[in-house]
Amino acid sequence: MAMTVHCDIVSAEGEIFSGLVEMVVAHGNLGDLGIAPGHAPLITNLKPGPITLTKQGGAHEVFYISGGFLEVQPNMVKVLADTVQRAADLDEAQAQEALKAAENALNLKGADFDYGAAAARLAEAAAQLRTVQQMRKGK
């Protein structure tokens, strides 16, 4: 039996996942992170994108987060995010439409243009698409 660590994924709306996992893979601000049982304690920012859990027994579950924080303690991994969705609940067509709308907004710069907000919408839509693609690849 593989070693496991307890993982909680929590959004502003409440707990989304709680259980034993063999591995957590997430996108930190400085690169990808793979957290396995026995990992050194750390706290880091997370970029928008997929979080992949390898659950006890080897099954994978993918979530989309809009960014947040990851905390690793000796017997626990905790992900705190504003928005969390199961990748299976994401609509690929809607994410592609949001990506196109964000790209168009960047091209139609006007006097009231908020580049930061447009870039954030573009990054979020691209991260949702990556999450859907990663979930499909894992099946």
Swiss-Prot record:
Molecular-function annotations in GO: ATP binding; proton-transporting ATP synthase activity, rotational mechanism
Cell compartments where the protein resides: Cell inner membrane
Underlying gene: atpC
Keyword Membrane tagged: yes
Pfam families: ATP-synt_DE, ATP-synt_DE_N
Family, similarity comment: Belongs to the ATPase epsilon chain family.
Topological category with respect to the lipid bilayer: Peripheral membrane protein
Keyword hit for Transport: yes
Organism for this UniProt entry: Pseudomonas putida (strain ATCC 47054 / DSM 6125 / CFBP 8728 / NCIMB 11950 / KT2440)
NCBIfam families reported for this sequence: ATP_synt_epsi (TIGR01216), PRK00571.1-4 (NF001847)
Keywords: ATP synthesis, Cell inner membrane, Cell membrane, CF(1), Hydrogen ion transport, Ion transport, Membrane, Transport
Gene Ontology cellular component terms for the protein in this record: plasma membrane; proton-transporting ATP synthase complex
InterPro entries: ATP_F1_dsu/esu_C_sf (IPR036794), ATP_synth_F1_dsu/esu (IPR001469), ATP_synth_F1_dsu/esu_N (IPR020546), ATP_synth_F1_esu_C (IPR020547), ATPsynth_dsu/esu_N (IPR036771)
Family matches, as PANTHER family: ATP SYNTHASE DELTA/EPSILON CHAIN, ATP SYNTHASE EPSILON CHAIN, CHLOROPLASTIC
Oligomeric form and interacting partners: F-type ATPases have 2 components, CF(1) - the catalytic core - and CF(0) - the membrane proton channel. CF(1) has five subunits: alpha(3), beta(3), gamma(1), delta(1), epsilon(1). CF(0) has three main subunits: a, b and c.
Function (record text): Produces ATP from ADP in the presence of a proton gradient across the membrane.
Superkingdom of the source species: Bacteria
Name of the featured protein: ATP synthase epsilon chain
